[in-house]
């Protein structure tokens, strides 16, 4: 049979399963794909196909991730599931799998466990905006009061990490029953309830092209008689000829006007997210712009030097450091297109960070970078990547 052409008529949303080991994340992933494939078309996935997740590299870090696609009545979903806890940590921090929302799987028989808490904290730190809970293995709990207790515990845990615990949809079911074809409340019905929650609780994400204009500077040229051209890939939004823009980061912010957009040596009247373009800037000298700055819509993004971040430090096997680092460690932080030196302050209870650890840190950079919460960065030493991180909170 010929492979069906992928019709993207429905809006696209990225989700993933998170939660403690053996609470049923992969079984649920298989159950969702199987139940929804039968109803809306698509490929059913077996547990083993998902569990044998292939290795991929993101920012030089090896991560095992399984990708599954499925459709609901209203949307197309891309869903990530990781086999091991370390893979989740790496995935969420590097943004290899950007999630518009997460499905937290928690066993009704066990209640919240250490990784349940850690994944909720990670989701908060890396900016996963929405969490839906699937209370799994409900077929193993016959005491309604116990179910209520577990639900309460999960809601409290979500609230503790600044998610709206009281308003979070919690679906009770059994991924195993659903995967076995059970049509009851805990089986297929629960999966359809989960699909409804995904459709209604997670808003459709803004497309990159609808965002405010932002382009990291990759290169700067001077063209005699025409002025200064800055090249890069537009990260989000649209830039039209004649629009005023700001140059932000490293130096004091300045305003300029875009007088031309070039792509593949052709002149255009606008450039948009995803385009590799050259922008001609009026009255800007070549030495006024450098790699590592960004061009953006005036007032939309500010330069900062001080922030907290969640970082993963590569293990020795991943080509990272062989030794731990301590407070006031000063590596380079690679943001978008350039390195900036910064010093790391560790949490009070942490004396050192070992290769392979993840940790919350406070960073002070020596030069300001155009920064927003959720921005990803690499930590480097002499051009070699030793860690990956994400901006959790801007301090000033």
Swiss-Prot record:
Record's catalysed reaction(s) = GTP + H2O = GDP + phosphate + H(+)
The answer to whether the entry has keyword Magnesium is yes
Root EC class: hydrolase
EC number(s) per entry? 3.6.5.3
Which residue ranges are recorded for the region named G2? Answer: 60-64
Recorded hits in Pfam families, A to Z, give:
GTP_EFTU, GTP_EFTU_D2, GTP_EFTU_D3
List positions binding GTP. Answer: 19-26, 81-85, 136-139
Which residues lie within the region annotated G4? 136-139
Q: Which GO terms describe its cellular component?
A: cytoplasm
Record's InterPro entries?
A: EF-Tu_GTP-bd, EF-Tu_GTPase, EFTu-like_2, EFTU_2, G_TR_CS, P-loop_NTPase, Small_GTP-bd, T_Tr_GTP-bd_dom
* Region annotation G5: where it falls in the sequence: 174-176
Amino-acid positions noted as binding Mg(2+) in the UniProt annotation, renumbered to this chain: 26
Region of interest (G3), residue spans: 81-84
Q: Which Gene3D superfamilies match?
A: P-loop containing nucleotide triphosphate hydrolases, Translation factors
Q: Where is this region: G1?
A: 19-26
What are the subcellular locations of this protein?
Cytoplasm
Ranges for domain tr-type G come to 10-206
Q: What does this protein do?
A: GTP hydrolase that promotes the GTP-dependent binding of aminoacyl-tRNA to the A-site of ribosomes during protein biosynthesis.
Give the similarity note.
Belongs to the TRAFAC class translation factor GTPase superfamily. Classic translation factor GTPase family. EF-Tu/EF-1A subfamily.
Assembly behavior: Monomer.
Instruction: Tell me which NCBIfam families the record gives.
Output: EF-Tu, PRK00049.1, PRK12735.1, PRK12736.1, small_GTP
This chain belongs to the protein called Elongation factor Tu
Q: Which organism is it from?
A: Cupriavidus pinatubonensis (strain JMP 134 / LMG 1197)
């Amino acid at each position: 049979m010929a492979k069906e052409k992928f019709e993207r008529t429905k809006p696209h949303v990225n989700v993933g399963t998170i939660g403690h080991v053996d609470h049923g994340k992969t079984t649920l992933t298989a159950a969702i794909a199987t139940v929804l494939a039968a109803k809306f078309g698509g490929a059913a996935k077996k547990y083993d196909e998902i569990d044998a997740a292939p290795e991929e590299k993101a920012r030089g870090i090896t991560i095992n991730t399984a990708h599954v696609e499925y459709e609901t009545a209203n949307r197309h979903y891309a869903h990530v599931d990781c086999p091991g806890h370390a893979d989740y940590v790496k995935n969420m921090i590097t943004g290899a799998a950007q999630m518009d929302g997460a499905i937290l799987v928690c066993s009704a028989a066990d209640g919240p466990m250490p990784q349940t808490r850690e994944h909720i904290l990670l989701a908060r730190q890396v900016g996963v905006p929405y969490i839906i809970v699937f209370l799994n293995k409900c077929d193993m709990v016959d005491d309604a009061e116990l179910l209520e207790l577990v639900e309460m515990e999960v809601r409290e845990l979500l609230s503790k990490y600044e998610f709206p615990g009281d308003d979070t949809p919690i679906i009770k079911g059994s991924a195993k029953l659903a995967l076995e074809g059970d049509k009851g409340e805990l089986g297929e019905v629960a999966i359809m309830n989960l699909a409804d929650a995904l459709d209604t609780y997670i808003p459709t994400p803004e497309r990159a092209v609808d965002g405010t204009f932002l382009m990291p500077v990759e290169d700067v040229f001077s063209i005699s008689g025409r002025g200064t051209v800055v090249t890069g890939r537009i990260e989000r939004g649209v830039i039209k000829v004649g629009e005023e823009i700001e140059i932000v980061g490293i130096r004091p912010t300045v305003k300029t006007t875009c007088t031309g957009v070039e792509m593949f040596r052709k002149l255009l009247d606008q450039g948009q997210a995803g385009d590799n373009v050259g922008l001609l800037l009026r009255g800007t000298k070549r030495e006024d712009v450098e790699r590592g700055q960004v061009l953006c819509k005036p007032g939309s993004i500010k330069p900062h030097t001080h922030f907290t971040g969640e970082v993963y430090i590569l293990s020795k096997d991943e080509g990272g450091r062989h030794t731990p680092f301590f407070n006031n460690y000063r590596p380079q932080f690679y943001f978008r297109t350039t390195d900036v030196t910064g010093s790391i302050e560790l949490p009070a209870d942490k004396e050192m960070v070992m290769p392979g650890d993840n940790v919350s840190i406070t960073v002070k950079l020596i030069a300001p970078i155009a920064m927003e919460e959720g921005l990803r960065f690499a930590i480097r030493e002499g051009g070699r990547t030793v860690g990956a991180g994400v901006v959790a909170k801007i301090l000033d």
